[in-house]
Curated annotation (Swiss-Prot):
Molecular function GO terms recorded: flavin adenine dinucleotide binding; FMN binding; oxidoreductase activity
Pfam families given in the database record: Flavodoxin_1
Homology family: Belongs to the flavodoxin family. MioC subfamily.
Domain Flavodoxin-like: 5-144
Keywords: Electron transport, Flavoprotein, FMN, Transport
Cofactor: FMN
GO cellular component: cytosol
Function comment: Probable electron transporter required for biotin synthase activity.
Protein name, per record: Protein MioC homolog
InterPro entries: Flavdoxin-like, Flavodoxin/NO_synth, Flavoprotein-like_sf
Amino acid sequence: MKTKICIITGSTLGGAEYVAEHIAEILEQQDYPVRLEHGPNFEEVIDEKCWLVVTSTHGAGELPDNIKPLFEKLAFHPKQLADLRFAVIGLGNSDYDTFCHAVDHVEQLLLSKDALQLCESLRMDMLTITDPEHTAEQWLPQFLSQL
């Protein structure tokens, strides 16, 4: 049986949600069990074994408001996540010096909790990428090959 993938989206204007929904459709077509969560709370996802976090960067390099509570609670929770495998897709704007800092935040926090990063994160510059769904789709095999 294929690995269940919990896709967690952090979005302010909807771009990350569109990417996540597109990736979820592709994974389902390939018979992966998928759980798509737009801004879940801690209890809803803490026991999942594989996270694909799709997030934009908001404000001064912060996580979007809809996933900030999840990662804030995780940061102060004593639970280690040695059983969790993860990858991150980030959307950002390279005009800002905080380009894709939300990706960095997610990576650093999950690694500090002993989670295993499956592959290099995808950092998309929305100034140059016109089709983020397609770009994420092109990255997806890199993620899947590590499951």
